Each structure stands twice: as C-alpha cells, then as structure tokens.
C-alpha cells in the first residue's frame, strides 16, 4: 500500500527489527541491508505524514542502523539520522523512544561528525527520565557505559534492562562482556 503511511511505517519497523537482529548476530551485512531496505518506506511514511513524530523517529533509527552496519554509510545517512530524530523530538519532546533513537544515532556516529558516546549517554538518561521502564534505554546506557570503561554503571544498567526484559539475549551478552566485580 504505497499511499498508506501506516503500512509504510509497519514495513519500516519490520526492517528495523531485522537490522537489530543483524546487529545482535554481529552480521553487519544483514544489519546494513535490512536498515537500508526500510529507509524508502520510512521516507514514504514521513512524506505522507510529516507531522508524525514516530514516522520521523523510525526514519532516523533506520539511518542510524545503516551506519552501524557500515561505517562509511555515515557520510550518506548521518544527516538523515540526526535530522529525522531531531524532528521527532521537536514534534514530541516527551517521547522516550525518540531520545533513545537519538542516543543510538549518536553512539554510532563518530564524534568528528557530531556524535559520540557522551552525547549518547545524555540521551539514554533522558529516555529513562521520560520512561523509567524502558529496557532498551537501560540496555543502550549499559553498552555506552561499557564502551567508556564505566563498568559498575554498565553492569547496573544492564541488570536493570534484564529485570525489565529477562529474555533479551543481547542484554545478557552485553552483561557477560563486563568483567566480574
């Protein structure tokens, strides 16, 4: 349904989930191709309803996921990731998911291109302020803390993620990467 924003959005969400599976399996080719396959659908959803914070968020998320699957894609998709998620936040400043998506984008975008782990951490914390039950925000906060060698904080965040979503394999894998106390 090319003229249904909702149908385009649902396709984009499916592509984003597949890209996340690729990330969890450490299959960058799958992560990149899945994310890239969803971008046109997300762009179409935004074109059909530019005032939807969620449609803008998923577009930014997919652009960020494409970057995570292929670092060179930052040149092509970096601006899309930042602008789309910024637009989502502008449309809905209380969206925990929008701040989470922005944080993931910053996590993968090199500091030289306007991203970085420190900026990501701020967004993950904001996402948790808006939704303290966000297992995904705790997961990403833990990943970011581990990246900066803040292992006690990383462990705490990942344990919180697993409390909220005990079946999340990626959170378990991330927790296993942290040296014991």
What are these regions (language model features)?
Residues 118, 136, 140-143, 147-181:
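Terminal, low-structured helical/coil segments at or just beyond the last alpha-helical repeat
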Residues 5-6, 53-54, 96-97, 135-136, ...:
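Helix-start (N-cap) detector for alpha-helical repeat units in TPR-like alpha-solenoids
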Residues 22-41, 71-87, 112-126, 147-160:
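Structural signature of tandem alpha-helical TPR/SEL1-like repeats
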Residues 2-3, 50, 93, 132, ...:
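Short coil turns that delineate tetratricopeptide repeat
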Residues 59-65, 78, 86-87, 92-129, ...:
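Alpha-helical adaptor scaffolds
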Residues 6-56:
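Mid-chain, structured segments of secreted extracytoplasmic proteins
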Residues 12, 17-26, 60, 65-74, ...:
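Short coil/turn linking the two alpha-helices of tandem helical-hairpin repeats
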């Amino acid at each position: 349904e090319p003229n249904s924003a909702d149908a385009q959005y649902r396709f984009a969400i499916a592509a984003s989930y597949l890209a996340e599976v690729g990330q969890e399996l450490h299959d960058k080719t799958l992560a990149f191709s899945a994310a890239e396959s969803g971008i046109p659908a997300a762009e179409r959803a935004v074109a059909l309803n530019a005032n939807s914070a969620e449609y803008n968020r998923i577009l930014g998320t997919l652009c960020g996921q494409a970057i995570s699957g292929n670092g060179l894609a930052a040149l092509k998709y970096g601006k899309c990731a930042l602008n789309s998620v910024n637009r989502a936040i502008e449309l809905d400043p209380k969206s925990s998911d929008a701040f989470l998506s922005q944080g993931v984008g910053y996590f993968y975008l090199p500091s030289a291109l306007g991203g970085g782990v420190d900026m990501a951490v701020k967004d993950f914390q904001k996402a948790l302020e808006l939704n303290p039950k966000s297992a995904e925000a705790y997961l990403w906060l833990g990943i970011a803390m581990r990246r900066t060698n803040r292992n006690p904080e990383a462990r705490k965040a990942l344990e919180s993620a697993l409390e909220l979503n005990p079946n999340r394999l990626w959170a378990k894998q991330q927790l296993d990467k942290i040296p014991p106390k």
